[in-house]
Every structure is written in C-alpha cells, then in structure tokens.
Amino acid sequence: MGFSETQEELVLRSWQSMKKDSESIALKFFLRIFEIAPAAKQMFSFLRDSGDDVPLESHPKACESATQLRKTGDVKVREATLRRLGATHVKAGVADAHFEVVKTALLDTIKDAVPEMWSPEMKGAWEEAYDQLAAAIKEEMKKAA
C-alpha cells in the first residue's frame, strides 16, 4: 500500500500540532520505548551508562528523530539519511522486534499528544508512514550488514 495524499495530510497536520512541544513529546516517546522494552536503553550509545536517570531532554540525539519531519516538511527521507540510519541500526544490533516496539511507542505517544485529532484514519496514516520508513531502514540494514 502506498502513502496517500490524505494520509500525508493527516501526518503533517498532527505534526504541526505537536511540533510546538516536540522536545517534550520526544522525551515521552523515548520513555515509552524504555517502558515497553527497558533493555532498549542499551542500544542508544548516549544512554548506555546513564543509570536510571535519563536526561533525554538535554541531549540533541534524543530529539533528532522526532524533529526530522519538522525540518524537512515532508515524509520522504533522503538516500544518504537512509544509508546512515541503516548502518547505525546494524551497529546497534537492531532487530525486527525492535521496530515493533518503536512503532507501538510512536503511536502511543502521538495518540497522547493529539487526542482531539486521533482517529482510526490518523492511526493508519502514522502506521503507513512508519512502516514505509522502517522497511527502507531494514533494506539499508541488509546492505550495511
């Protein structure tokens, strides 16, 4: 299934609403990942030895993924970015199951951030955007392995 104009509009509209609070939302996103899969913290080089206190809000890498869409204004990702993401994910030991954890955390975070906008259609749009990005990263991971 492709990413339709309607789905892109839903993602961009919700992102417009969320971007004013993107740092806080990024923090909630990462904390949700660690709530679902506590061991995931070890996959982030800047968090490996941080103990229980995770100062994500002051670390630029923590917000990078959440703000990428805002910077580009588009859901498409450049080839160079995909190659870098693929190599980074291989180096970190990311597996298919990790992508599902991130997807769940992402959807939960967005639902909490824009409850007045949340709908089955919006959920589907974010799922499609995420699934396409995850598939592209996985493809680059195969090349980098």
From Swiss-Prot:
Binds 1 heme group per subunit. Expressed in embryonic (embryos, coleoptiles and seminal roots) and vegetative (leaves and roots) organs. A motif (Homodimerization) lies at residues 35-39, 96-108. Its main location: cytoplasm. It catalyses: Fe(III)-heme b-[protein] + nitric oxide + H2O = Fe(II)-heme b-[protein] + nitrite + 2 H(+). Keywords: Cytoplasm, Heme, Iron, Metal-binding, Nucleus, Oxidoreductase, Oxygen transport, Transport. Heme b binds at S45, H59, K61, R84, T88, H89. The record marks K123 as: Homodimerization. The keyword ATP-binding does not apply. Residues 2-142 form the Globin domain. It is found in: Cytoplasm; Nucleus. It is an enzyme of class 1 (oxidoreductase). GO terms for molecular function: heme binding; metal ion binding; oxidoreductase activity; oxygen binding; oxygen carrier activity. Its cofactor is heme b. Pfam families: Globin (PF00042). Its EC number is 1.7.2.-. The keyword Oxidoreductase applies. One of its GO terms (cellular component) is nucleus. Phytoglobin that reduces nitrite to nitric oxide under anoxic conditions (e.g. during flooding or in waterlogged soil). May not function as an oxygen storage or transport protein. Has an unusually high affinity for O(2) through an hexacoordinate heme iron because of a very low dissociation constant. Belongs to the plant globin family. This is Anaerobic nitrite reductase NSHB5. It comes from Oryza sativa subsp. indica (Rice). The gene is NSHB5.
